[in-house]
Amino acid sequence: MNYILIGLISYFCGAIPFSYLLPKLRKIDIRRTGSGNVGGTNALRAAGPVIGFICMVLDGVKAFVPVLVFSLIFKDIHYTGISSIFAVLGHDFPVFLRFKGGKGVASTTGVFFALCPICGFTFLATWISITLLTKYVSLASIVGMYAASFVAFFFNKDYGVLFLLLSTLSTLRHSENIERLVNKSERKTDLIKIIKKRG
């Protein structure tokens, strides 16, 4: 019963579509703008840096909170794993948007910070560096998640396995991006330019 309850609570927390709701304040339907993805990067491009970065943070927080709470209450990797996976699945497949959500990067990052803060900072450092150098957010996200997963193994092998699972799920969600990266047709995102132009 605990597994089901934890899964449901975590799922519905993760399913809150901040990256859809906040752009709506500017009358922007994120599903019909840019890539159509209900995630922080598309919100950043479509609604500007302020709303975009707030969406990224909130998409992380909605996974961070349930995972941290349940990890403190139960102190058991099984409960923690259920909470983590379902929080990310809620973001990826939100019932409120007919199960069409994001790619799980920010929510997975929220899990990193909840269970292994240094892993969260590893992701951020990698993500920022690669995004600034290549302007490919998808590449930065994928590499960043696996870098965080690698670091996790040095602190807690169970977390390492969990993070690797979540990273793989997000990688699968990035299949079209990966194809475009291979074909050199992936859209670039100049963070500095966006901030200067629309800040």
Curated annotation (Swiss-Prot):
UniProt keywords, alphabetically: Cell inner membrane, Cell membrane, Lipid biosynthesis, Lipid metabolism, Membrane, Phospholipid biosynthesis, Phospholipid metabolism, Transferase, Transmembrane, Transmembrane helix
Pathway: Lipid metabolism; phospholipid metabolism
Any one Pfam family match given in the protein's UniProt record, by short name: G3P_acyltransf
Major localization listed first in the record, in broad terms: membrane
InterPro entries: G3P_acylTferase_PlsY
SMART domains documented for this protein: G3P_acyltransf
Keyword match DNA-binding: no
Record-level GO cellular component terms: plasma membrane
Keyword Isomerase part of the UniProt annotation: no
Molecular functions (GO terms): acyl-phosphate glycerol-3-phosphate acyltransferase activity
Transmembrane regions: 3-23, 50-70, 77-97, 110-130, 136-156
Reaction equation(s) it catalyzes: an acyl phosphate + sn-glycerol 3-phosphate = a 1-acyl-sn-glycero-3-phosphate + phosphate
Documented EC number(s): 2.3.1.275
Subunit structure: Probably interacts with PlsX.
Similarity comment text for this entry: Belongs to the PlsY family.
Function: Catalyzes the transfer of an acyl group from acyl-phosphate (acyl-PO(4)) to glycerol-3-phosphate (G3P) to form lysophosphatidic acid (LPA). This enzyme utilizes acyl-phosphate as fatty acyl donor, but not acyl-CoA or acyl-ACP.
Entry protein name: Glycerol-3-phosphate acyltransferase
Organism from which the protein derives: Pseudothermotoga lettingae (strain ATCC BAA-301 / DSM 14385 / NBRC 107922 / TMO)
Recorded name of the encoding gene: plsY
